[in-house]
């Protein structure tokens, strides 16, 4: 079973932050230390802030636990939703999978500054970063999708023992019509996004398909 806590996961400190520190982090960074009178009313409780933030296009966070272990960290922003899956490797928490969903047309925003939502307020899977770790080789695959059926792919391999690395970049054609998914309906309606195996084309995680541009 999943459990949601509206708390910040601190990768540097390798821990889930307290409610007080989570809210202070939102005040300091997101609100630039200047919350207004209305915001202050909700900044005394992390879940109440999440409810307010969802309805008012503000930033909030949540750490997802599965069977009492840390499973994922979600950052909700007005224009994007970031999902970082969490695992343990050699005694440290790592992010083996990172998903970025756009809530608005990023190209239109950077071109004109206008906020243009997708049809039905759907989300668009804009990026995937998939990492695998072994003592001999670490692999990172990053895919950035565009709305015009193109994707930028970066394949990186590092060899810790030899202290060597190599990277390959390429542009590929891809049918991004499959990248759309419904938007959350409530402040706590995010668990369905964790089911990436059913939400996302399996080919996006297939190194052979990516290498041959067969997407």
Model-based region annotation:
Residues 89-144:
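An exposed acidic His-Trp-rich patch
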Residues 74-79, 84, 95-103, 130, ...:
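Beta-turn initiation residues at beta-strand->coil junctions
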Residues 1-49, 120-215:
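Long terminal segments
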Residues 82-85, 105-112, 164-168:
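A short, polar/proline- and glycine-enriched secondary-structure boundary/capping micro-motif
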